[in-house]
A protein has these predicted regions:
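C-terminal motif of bacterial Sec signal peptides marking the signal peptidase cleavage site
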Residues: 16-18
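Long, intrinsically disordered, low-complexity segments
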Residues: 100-103, 180, 262-312, 433, ...
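An aromatic- and glycine-enriched ligand-binding surface/loop that stacks and positions planar moieties
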Residues: 20-80, 152, 178, 186-187, ...
Length: 607
């Protein structure tokens, strides 16, 4: 499935809303609204205005706010060639949730207008479908809000500017909000069409999204709020949503990993539930592949923690694997001994173009685009430079649904609400591990990873004692599958595992790939790099290049510029799991005689 750019209606929803610093308030009079809701096609046009909000893909041109590689760089997978990005350390002045409420207002307008003005215009089937779409949008936006702020003011109706009690009400408890989201999601799954055309949201798209957000909420309830009954409710919803997609027979794992992200046309791929297509003729291009072309210098790249997380081809972690040379971290060996997603995600040679780690991500560019590197003096094709990129992005993948589904089932088994069978593992993790390999990968020695066996799970010595082995390995699968995509920081928060980002506790967060400089990068051992190249040996010793010790420059690349982040755990007045509301927003409420409670764990102001 694909969707296009609906430039004609890009500003459509603005006809029905206006903004201020607290919530989006409606315009006092909007003539367009009175005459708009007259047909199903008008509803479709209004619905289409949500697409780029929820399905940005690679972004457009230089513009991107939630694009892979470029925007998901705050987690334990990446290292910056500088001080690492910090967690919020004080209540900000002006940031808040106004942008979310803009979309909630738009969704509530859609719900209201369909119900109050279109019952005699739409058929019963049309009414149910479009109401399902509207409630899906509302549920998604509140799920996003709650994931960020915890308790939030809940609205299931269009707020009137004259109703100050409503406009300035305090937060609604998270469980009450999410119970309403649960109802919206259930309605959407029961009423959205199974098929509404190749460019439109259908029930399978809705189910994929519900599987994601229900899993997230179940985890929050289990690990952060210690509420097993609420956790069970949402884990069950995640499983049910996954079942809808999996039982349809429409989806499968058929493409090699790299082709998922480098192909221009994914319309016939069973791996993809929804994707964004790019078209130069329409002026719709992106820049993400340009930052994957091994010519563009990158200051953010994969760290050693991510590298070590990749499972060996026998299905075991690197410390317990029986694969020959499993403890050899040279890139050539990692490609042969690790899961195929490693080779598909990274350039096969260490390079200074990835300044923080010498390992360059190439996950989001087709293999053919890097053929220029085989030619002396070659340069990337114009299509893979600047904002000329045309490869499409799979905004919803079948693999994600499978991993959401199996994780939810595994979580339910820990809550006494079901069990996981080998058949479940085969339908999910093992189906993904059995995806086809690109011929170029095979020629480099890449192999498929052995199936996961429930009766013989790895005993990873790095596993947290409070995480069962099955969940540990499922979480590993997510990390390999979704590197540089949307989910890692969300995963750490919902598992209550932000300690994984503590650079004081884990040097692997600040170091990169293994580099044998004399053999692999001899041209970098020049006087101009004195004091700039530093490696960490396998035993943890640091060696800095001094112009004479080039032969010793073998180890994990660890430049002195890679600095750790400040403490963020168990610090008074800091809650790294939830985001504070800006003090100006709280002051605005107070000035009007109302109270807005600050986010849990944060003071009312930055003073």
């Amino acid at each position: 499935m694909k969707f296009k750019i609906f430039s004609v209606i890009a500003g459509l929803a603005l006809l029905f809303s206006a903004c201020d610093e607290v919530l989006d308030r409606p315009s006092p009079t909007v003539a367009e609204d009175e005459s708009y809701w007259v047909s199903a096609e008008k509803v479709r046009l209004y619905s289409n205005s949500f697409y780029l909000h929820y399905f940005e893909g690679y972004g457009t041109g230089w513009t991107h706010s939630s694009a892979p590689l470029l925007d998901y760089t705050f987690n334990d997978d990446v290292v910056n060639y500088s001080t690492q990005a910090q967690f919020t350390r004080a209540v900000p002045t002006s940031t808040g949730w106004g942008g979310n409420y803009k979309w909630i207002r738009r969704a509530n307008i859609m719900v209201d207008r369909i119900d109050s003005r279109m019952k005699d215009i739409l058929s019963v089937e049309e009414y149910s479908h479009w109401m399902g779409i509207a409630r899906l949008y509302r549920g998604l936006e509140f799920a996003r809000l709650v994931n960020t702020y915890g308790d939030v003011p809940y609205y299931d109706h269009v707020v009137k500017t004259s109703d100050l009690e409503d406009l300035y009400k305090d937060r609604t408890p998270r469980n009450e909000v999410m119970d309403n989201v649960y109802d919206d999601f259930e309605y959407a799954l029961a009423n959205i069409r199974l098929n509404d055309g190749a460019q439109n949201i259908n029930r399978y798209v809705a189910a994929a999204l519900v599987s994601r957000w229900a899993l997230y909420e179940g985890s929050w309830q289990k690990y952060y709020y210690n509420n097993p009954s609420q956790a069970t409710k949402f884990f069950n919803l995640a499983v049910a949503a996954g079942d809808i997609v999996m039982n349809s027979g429409r989806f499968d794992i058929t493409l090699d990993f790299r082709s998922l992200f480098g192909s221009k046309d994914l319309s016939s791929s069973k791996d993809v539930i929804l994707y964004r297509k790019y078209d130069a003729a329409q002026g719709v291009t992106h820049c993400v592949a340009s930052y994957s072309n091994v010519s563009e210098s990158r200051s953010v790249g994969p760290n050693l923690s991510l590298i070590k997380s990749f499972v060996c081809v026998d299905g075991k972690d690197w410390q317990t694997s029986s694969v020959e040379n499993s403890k050899d971290f040279s890139l050539a060996n990692l490609i042969k001994t690790r899961d195929s997603r490693f080779e598909a995600s990274f350039y096969h040679k260490p390079t200074v173009k990835s300044k923080s780690c010498y390992l360059y991500p190439v996950k989001f560019i087709p293999r053919s685009a890097l053929k220029y590197l085989e030619v002396k003096g070659g340069a990337p094709d114009v299509e893979y430079t600047s904002v000329n990129n045309l490869n499409g992005y799979p905004v919803l993948r079948y693999a994600e649904v499978l991993l959401n589904w199996i994780e939810a089932k595994a979580e339910l088994s820990t809550l006494g609400a079901g069990s996981v069978t080998q058949a479940d593992i085969d339908l999910s993790v093992n189906k993904i591990r059995n995806r086809p390999l690109a011929q170029e990968a095979v020629e480099r020695g890449v192999q498929k990873t052995a199936p996961m066996e429930l009766a013989a799970l790895p005993d990873d010595p790095s596993r947290d004692s409070d995480v069962p082995a099955l969940l540990w390995e499922i979480r590993r699968e997510r990390r390999m599958e979704f590197a540089f995509e949307h989910s890692r920081i969300i995963d750490l928060r919902r598992w209550k595992k932000l300690e994984y980002m503590d650079t004081d506790a884990n040097a692997d967060l600040l170091s990169g790939t293994w580099v044998n400089f004399p053999a692999e990068c001899p041209d970098d051992l020049v006087d101009g790099n004195k004091g700039k190249i530093r490696v960490m040996t396998a035993s943890g010793d640091l060696i800095t290049f001094d112009g004479k010790n080039g032969a010793k420059m073998v180890g994990f690349f660890y430049p002195a510029e890679n600095k750790g982040r400040l403490p963020f755990l168990n610090v008074p007045n800091i809650n790294p799991y939830l985001t504070p509301v800006g003090s100006n927003t709280i002051t605005d409420y107070s000035n009007k005689g109302y109270k807005l409670t600050q986010t849990e764990g944060w003071p009312e102001s930055s003073n």
